[in-house]
Each structure stands twice: as structure tokens, then as C-alpha cells.
């Protein structure tokens, strides 16, 4: 993604050089008419299809913009919070740190620039925090209790979703506090601890979620004990074991450490300063966090042997906070195998690191350590490299060079620590999962998060929701052969009608048959959201004017200012900005009440539903006695909600 708008500012259906006629069979005409009539079809927007958590993004944007109205006794801000947290109980956290694959998928990229979904999500979460919003009262307990092993994003999300289904849980967490990667893997200036604590407390406030911290399952509690005392087990232990560099001598060199341990020592408050010259090998978000923290921590002159950074990171010591008063700037270098454009780290995070004084070397790979007589690393040997067709880096002969270092950090990947749980491990030291996040061959065992496959936080949250649903179905002895093709949280028209006391009435067989006025069914509506994602080609993009994105302000210190700067960097949108940004949403696959179909219908066949019967998704209807099948309504529908197909 880029902050710069590089696409043209106008939309053209046909481009210069187009010379192929459209298929005339798409529209079957007799004069100005056809035997096709409009029907209203709900599809999933690509933002939601691109969101690993499966959030109803279009839904909460519709609420923020004022299009979808809340119940009479609820503020729209709280209604948006409920919609956003149906899939993800951490809107404040994810609004800050999610790399937002939803924005890459946004159809508005084909107009001018994506909708700032991530920024609006942070606004929803921070508003909920400021106003003290709570989750809805959970249902009565079912009597089932699940052991959730791991209190990070996946484990907490699973406990949340399970409680909403009526199931109690006990969370076993090896650390002293809950939060996992939110707390121990990401610096506090990106995930403010007061907001994190509030979002965790909100989950626990649902009740019947027991927490046992400082407990290692496999050592303090055995798997057999969990099988005996609980109705199901969910493994959400994360991937807290960092991989070392594949160079000789790495494991027995004291000042060579993993990025996971570096960040854990910093976030735990033990690491107050780092080394004079720090190199981090990576290219992903963890490596960027390492170098950004290193620039903030700085160094101190003449550090004592027992206070060296690697001893603190290894857990053998802890720095006195007084060290912070005498620290100086450190030289920090980030190396990556790939070119800048191919780095997996979020582009803005890399930009910020450069602003803060980090040196970034792209297209290089480590080939060896340089050690002194004491066995400490004093530098890293590197070479330019190319990536072959199998994704393996190949060093280029004659391009070798050295970079001095007092601390070398590896952030090239993470794996699971399955000590005491070896019977669960696959050949990658992770836990196997099927499509339902069940552990194959272990009845009643489920898994979610990085221990399945290290990926994004939003992925862990989405997997936890699926696992919770699978646990619920396990208790009900329901067996499904497959998940939905588009496996996300969808708008549900029937739920919306129920919310506004407009649910279909019982069928009356004495009513005149053949009429569309009966209230026993939802007429002329098809829900394909679980099967289809709507592409931009199905929209009438010419409807949308160019509008600049409402961007958050990022407070990024320069290289001269970064030392000791641990204040939050990402500032929230104002309410006015959030509403304006939500209005840029094109509502792909769902009516957004623009009136185009009503205005342009030459037969006055399309009409607005009466206000006392109108809801989201039921704003317009069609009088088929008047409709001639001219398809104009479908052509001018900006959101692709109208299909010409009824009667075929």
C-alpha cells in the first residue's frame, strides 16, 4: 500500500485501445425490453474477503457513515463497536498494528485510493475505550468448560467467542500477564498498555473465564489432566521460539539473540539499553520493531559485563531504570534478503524506521559471524544475493562485505516451543490443524494462532473464531464436511429485520397466492455472500467522485529525537474524519440508498420501501407489473447489488 495516489482521477468503462465487443448474450432484448427482471443480491465485499479475522467491515463503515441505523436506545458509536467486535474483540489494538490486507483488497483502489478501514477501526475501538462500552450479556452457561492453552490474541479471542456461545473456559498462560504478542512481542508505543488492558478486561468481564497465569502446560499441568478435567482443549500457545541465523557458531555465540527474546526483554521492562552497534537480520514486522526499539533504547558507555544486553535478553539479569538517564544513540542496521518492495514488513513501518535513523540494507544475506578471541561476535559477514525459483537465497560471489556489531539479532522467523508437548508436534515443530482447526487424531482437541502457522495477529483472531465454532459443533455432535467458500462474518438480513421488529410473519395459506405483498417471506432477495466476493467490474464506478483519504497523523521522531521517545506514534482520527472516511466506502455488494435505480427507471417500476418497513438491504423494491426488463437499474447501481435474472 502507498500513501500516494497514483491512479487516474476519473473512471472510464472503456480504455484507449479497447476493440473487443461485449457478449450480446449478457442482455437479452426485444426492443427496449427483456425477459429478465431485477433481483437484489447480497455479495461479500473484497475488503471482508481479504480480512483474515473476517470482520464485517462494510457493516461497521455503514454504521459510522450513518447509513445503517442502530436500535432506538443505542448510540451509533456503540452499535459500530458491536458490529466490529462480532469477529474481533480487539478493535483498538488491531486498528493500530494490523497491516490491513483489507485495504489492499478494497475496490476503491480502482477509483483513486483505498478506504482507510484500519483508521476507522481504531476510532471505533478507542471510542469504546473512552466511553467504557461493554460486550452484550452472554447467554446462560451450557455446562461445558474448555481449557484454552495460551492467553494471547488467539486464546483470548477463542475464550471470548466461546463465552458468547454459552461455554466457560479456563485460560492457561505461561507469562505473568495475558496479552501474548500484543504485550510481549510489540512495543508499547504501538500497543498502549492501558488500552490493551482495557480490551482484555472487557473480555474477562463476560464472566466464567478463569485465568491461570505463570502456568506451563506440559510441565505444571499435563495433557492427560486437561483431557480429564475439561470437555475440550484449545491450543493457542503461539510461536515464541525465534529461529537463529543459519551460519556457523550462531548458537554458542553469547551476543547473538532472537528478535522474539529481544522484544520480550524490552516489553517486560528488563532491557533499558542495548549495544553500541546493533544488526537485525529480517525484513518482516518483528525485525522493524527490533530496530525501532534499539534506536529508542540507545547504548551506554563502558557497560559492565553483567549488564550487557544479551545477558538481560537471556534472562540472567535486568537493567536498572537509572541507566536510561545516561544512554546515547546506537548505530542500528536492518538487513533483508529482499528488495525494499518485496519486504514483508508493512511499508509505513519501514518508512518510519528510516526516519528514526535506522540503516536498511536490502538484497543481502548473512554468510558468517566475525568473532573475537573471547568468542563474542564483533561483526557479521554479508553478501549480495538473489532468490532462486524455490525461494532460496543464493549469495553472489565477489559481493561479500562486513558490518561491525556488538549485538546481532535474528528475526527471520518463529516456531513453537512444544517442550513437554512433543506428542502434539509435527515435523515443523508446530501443531497440525484441519480446515475446522481440529487437531487430527485427537478427539476434542482444537488449535488456533501462530502455533498452526506463524502469520498475522488478525489471522490468529480469525482462526480462533473458527475453532470456537468447531468446538460448539463438537459439543452438539454436528459434523460439517466443509467451511463456507467465503468464510467471514456476513451481514444477515433476517437478523436486521428481527432487530427492527420486521421479521417475516407465519405463512398464511389462505392468502391470495401469487402476490408479492405477503409478509411471510423476504421477497426478491438472494444472499450469495457465503459464495461470492464482488469485484470492481460489477460496480458502476463512474458514480464515485474523487475524494482524498482522511489519514491519521503519525508522530514519527527523527533520528535526532528518537532516543528515549516511547510515546504513542499513531494518533486517532477525529469523529468528523472517521465519518467522512466511512462515507468513502462504496458499499460493494449491498445497497447504500443512492436512489439511482429509482431515479433512472423509465417505467417507475423501482420504488422505495415505505419507511416503516425499510432496513439496510430492503431500501428499494420492484413492481413487476411495470418492469419491462430494460436493465437500466442494474447498469446504474453503483454497488453491484442489482442483478438482471429474475424470471430466467
What is the meaning of each model-derived region?
Residues 1-145, 193, 235-252, 260, ...:
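Ferredoxin-type iron-sulfur electron-transfer modules and their immediate structural context
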Residues 254-278, 284, 296, 306, ...:
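FAD-site-proximal beta/loop scaffold in flavoenzymes
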Residues 22-24, 48, 55-72, 110, ...:
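Beta1-alpha1 glycine-rich phosphate/pyrophosphate-binding loop at the start
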Residues 149, 172-174, 214, 235-237, ...:
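Generic beta-strand/beta-sheet core signal
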Residues 216-220, 262-265, 340, 367:
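Short acidic loop-to-helix transition motifs that present clustered carboxylates
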Residues 302-306, 333, 343, 361-363, ...:
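Acidic/polar loop patches that form or flank catalytic/metal-binding clefts of enzymes
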Residues 141-154, 274-284:
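Beta1/beta-strand and adjacent pyrophosphate-binding region of the FAD-binding site
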Residues 140-141, 145-149, 197-247, 368-381, ...:
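Feature captures the FAD/FMN-dependent oxidoreductase FAD-binding
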Amino acid at each position: 500500500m502507498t500513501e500516494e495516489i497514483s491512479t487516474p482521477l476519473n473512471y472510464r468503462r472503456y480504455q484507449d485501445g479497447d476493440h473487443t465487443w461485449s457478449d450480446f448474450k449478457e442482455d437479452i432484448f426485444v426492443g427496449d425490453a427483456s425477459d429478465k427482471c431485477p433481483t437484489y443480491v447480497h455479495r461479500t465485499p473484497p475488503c471482508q474477503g481479504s480480512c483474515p479475522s473476517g470482520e464485517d467491515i462494510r457493516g461497521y463503515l455503514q454504521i459510522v457513515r450513518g447509513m445503517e441505523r442502530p436500535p432506538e436506545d443505542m448510540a451509533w458509536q456503540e452499535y459500530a463497536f458491536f458490529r466490529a467486535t462480532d469477529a474481533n474483540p480487539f478493535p483498538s489494538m488491531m486498528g493500530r498494528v494490523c497491516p490491513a490486507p483489507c485495504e489492499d483488497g478494497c475496490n476503491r483502489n480502482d477509483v483513486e485510493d483505498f478506504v482507510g478501514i484500519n483508521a476507522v477501526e481504531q476510532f471505533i475501538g478507542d471510542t469504546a475505550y473512552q466511553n467504557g462500552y461493554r460486550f452484550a450479556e452472554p447467554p446462560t452457561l451450557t455446562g461445558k468448560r474448555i481449557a484454552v492453552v495460551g492467553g494471547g490474541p488467539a486464546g483470548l479471542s477463542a475464550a471470548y467467542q466461546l463465552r458468547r456461545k454459552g461455554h466457560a473456559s479456563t485460560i492457561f498462560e505461561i507469562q505473568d500477564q495475558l496479552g501474548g504478542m500484543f504485550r510481549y512481542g510489540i512495543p508499547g508505543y504501538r500497543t498502549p498498555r492501558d488500552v490493551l488492558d482495557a480490551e482484555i478486561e472487557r473480555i474477562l468481564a463476560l464472566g466464567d473465564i478463569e485465568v491461570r497465569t505463570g502456568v506451563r502446560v506440559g510441565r505444571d499441568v499435563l495433557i492427560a489432566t486437561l483431557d480429564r478435567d475439561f470437555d475440550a482443549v484449545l491450543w493457542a500457545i503461539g510461536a515464541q521460539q525465534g529461529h537463529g541465523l543459519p551460519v556457523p557458531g550462531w548458537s554458542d555465540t553469547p551476543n547473538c539473540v532472537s528478535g522474539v527474546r529481544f522484544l520480550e526483554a524490552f516489553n517486560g521492562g528488563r532491557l533499558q539499553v542495548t549495544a553500541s552497534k546493533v544488526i537485525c537480520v529480517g525484513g518482516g514486522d518483528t525485525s522493524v520493531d527490533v530496530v525501532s526499539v534499539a534506536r529508542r533504547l540507545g547504548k551506554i558507555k563502558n557497560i559492565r559485563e553483567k549488564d550487557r544486553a544479551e545477558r538481560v535478553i537471556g534472562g540472567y539479569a535486568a537493567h536498572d531504570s537509572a541507566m536510561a538517564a545516561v544512554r546515547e544513540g546506537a548505530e542500528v542496521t536492518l538487513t533483508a534478503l529482499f528488495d525494499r518492495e518485496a519486504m514483508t514488513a508493512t511499508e509505513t513501518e519501514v518508512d518510519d524506521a528510516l526516519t528514526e535513523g535506522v540503516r536498511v540494507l536490502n538484497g543481502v544475506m548473512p554468510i558468517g559471524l566475525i568473532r573475537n578471541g573471547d568468542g563474542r561476535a564483533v561483526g557479521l559477514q554479508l553478501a549480495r544475493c538473489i532468490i532462486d525459483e524455490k525461494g532460496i537465497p543464493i549469495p553472489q560471489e565477489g559481493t561479500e562485505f562486513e558490518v561491525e556489531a556488538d549485538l546481532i539479532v535474528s528475526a527471520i522467523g518463529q516456531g513453537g516451543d512444544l517442550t513437554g508437548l512433543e506428542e502434539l508436534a509435527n515435523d515443523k515443530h508446530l501443531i497440525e490443524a484441519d480446515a475446522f482447526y481440529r487437531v487430527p487424531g485427537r478427539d476434542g482437541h482444537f488449535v488456533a494462532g501462530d502455533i498452526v502457522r506463524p502469520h498475522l495477529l488478525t489471522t490468529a483472531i480469525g482462526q480462533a473464531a473458527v475453532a470456537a465454532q468447531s468446538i460448539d459443533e463438537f459439543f452438539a455432535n454436528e459434523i460439517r464436511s466443509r467451511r463456507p467458500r467465503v468464510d467471514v462474518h456476513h451481514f444477515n438480513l433476517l437478523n436486521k429485520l428481527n432487530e427492527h421488529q420486521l421479521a417475516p410473519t407465519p405463512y398464511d395459506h389462505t392468502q391470495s397466492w401469487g402476490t408479492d405483498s405477503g409478509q411471510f417471506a423476504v421477497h426478491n432477495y438472494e444472499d450469495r455472500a457465503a459464495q461470492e466476493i464482488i469485484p470492481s467490474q460489477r460496480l458502476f464506478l463512474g458514480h464515485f467522485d474523487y475524494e482524498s483519504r482522511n489519514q491519521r497523523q503519525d508522530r514519527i521522531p527523527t533520528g535526532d529525537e528518537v532516543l528515549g521517545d516511547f510515546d504513542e506514534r499513531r494518533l486517532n482520527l477525529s469523529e468528523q474524519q472517521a465519518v467522512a472516511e466511512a462515507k468513502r466506502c462504496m458499499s460493494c455488494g449491498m445497497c447504500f440508498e443512492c436512489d439511482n435505480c429509482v431515479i433512472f427507471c423509465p417505467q417507475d417500476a423501482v420504488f422505495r420501501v415505505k419507511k416503516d418497513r425499510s432496513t439496510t438491504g430492503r431500501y428499494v423494491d420492484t413492481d413487476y407489473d411495470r418492469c419491462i426488463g430494460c436493465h437500466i437499474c442494474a447498469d446504474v447501481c453503483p454497488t453491484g447489488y442489482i442483478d438482471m435474472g429474475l424470471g430466467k
